[in-house]
A protein has these predicted regions:
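Sec-dependent signal peptide recognition
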Residues: 2-8
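C-terminal motif of bacterial Sec signal peptides marking the signal peptidase cleavage site
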Residues: 14-15
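Terminal domain-start segments
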Residues: 24-126
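Short, solvent-exposed loop/turn segments at conserved positions within beta-propeller repeat blades
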Residues: 74-76, 127-132, 169-174, 232-235
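Surface-exposed loop/turn elements that mediate protein-protein interactions on large endomembrane-trafficking
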Residues: 81-103, 129-146, 177-195, 233-245
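Repeated scaffold domains used in trafficking and secretory/extracellular systems
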Residues: 105-112, 147-156, 199-208
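Blade-terminus and WD-like Trp-Asp/Gly-His loop motifs, strongest in beta-propeller folds
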Residues: 114-118, 151-162, 208-215
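Beta-strand C-termini and the immediately following turn/loop, strongest in propeller blades
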Residues: 124-129, 162-168, 173, 218-224
Length: 245
């Protein structure tokens, strides 16, 4: 009887220890990433690990941005940008500025940033009273995908990523968005769908670079570093994370 009680006691003790280790590990991972994903269709797996400034700089030097800044080809005329859409019935997509040089809250100004020729999408930015956003526009269909900030195409054209706006703007999200490039079978048509959105709790990203199609390196700082230094963290406040997904 005593032996039986002893065996049961040991099993319970080991079980508690295992649960404690699992909880501790989960807390460590949460402390590192402090992120939650908001996928569109189903949960996506992602992982944050610490990397170095040297790795970040090396990846920056190697990476080539694929945005073609052919802004001279689509000039703004009388406050309006017109972009040709190559559908079954060719048409134009128009972006018109309003109320420039005023203090009206309805002010808006658009800028043609360029295009990703590899996936047939224009990039247009919109600046508003207290807001900024990016439009990723399909050149063949005119379909518009709304992004937080300026996008960057991955090395093999599988994904697009963009950060949030700089920390400190009231009401704006903090984090990173990742978009999947979908190619229609037996055609040259591309579409964009959200793959992953990560909203960290206590840190904010300031820069990023693609290391591969499934790995992004981020330069980040704790939210407190922004709050305690008028929105500009000290150099030593920054650290680097590797996002694998």
């Amino acid at each position: 009887m005593i032996r039986h009680f002893y065996i049961v006691f040991i099993m319970i003790l080991l079980s508690c220890k295992k649960d404690s280790q699992t909880t501790e590990k989960a807390q460590q991972v949460d402390s590192l990433s402090n992120g939650t994903s908001k996928p569109i269709e189903s949960p996506k797996q992602f992982e944050f690990t610490v990397t170095t400034e040297q790795d970040f700089i090396k990846a920056k030097a190697k990476f080539k941005d694929k945005l073609t800044q052919d802004t001279i080809n689509f000039p703004k005329i009388n406050g309006e940008i017109k972009l040709p859409i190559q559908g079954d019935k060719p048409t134009q997509l128009s972006f018109r500025d309003t109320l420039l040089n005023t203090d009206d809250e309805n002010i808006r100004e658009y800028k043609y940033e360029g295009q990703f020729k590899d996936i047939d999408h224009y990039v247009v930015s919109g600046t508003f009273w207290e807001h900024y956003e990016i439009y990723l526009i399909n050149k063949k269909t005119g379909e518009n995908t709304l992004l937080w900030n300026n996008p960057t195409l991955s090395p093999s054209n599988q994904f697009i990523a963009n950060l949030s706006l700089p920390f400190g703007l009231e009401g704006t999200p903090i984090g990173i968005q990742i978009w999947r490039i979908n190619k229609t079978k037996n055609t040259s048509n591309f579409s964009i769908s959200k793959h992953l959105e990560i909203n960290p709790i206590d840190w904010a990203p300031t820069d990023f670079v693609w290391k591969s199609d499934k790995i992004i390196l981020l330069k980040v700082a704790k939210v407190d570093a922004f709050l305690n230094n008028n929105g500009i963290p000290h150099k030593n406040d920054y650290y680097y994370l590797k996002l694998s997904f």
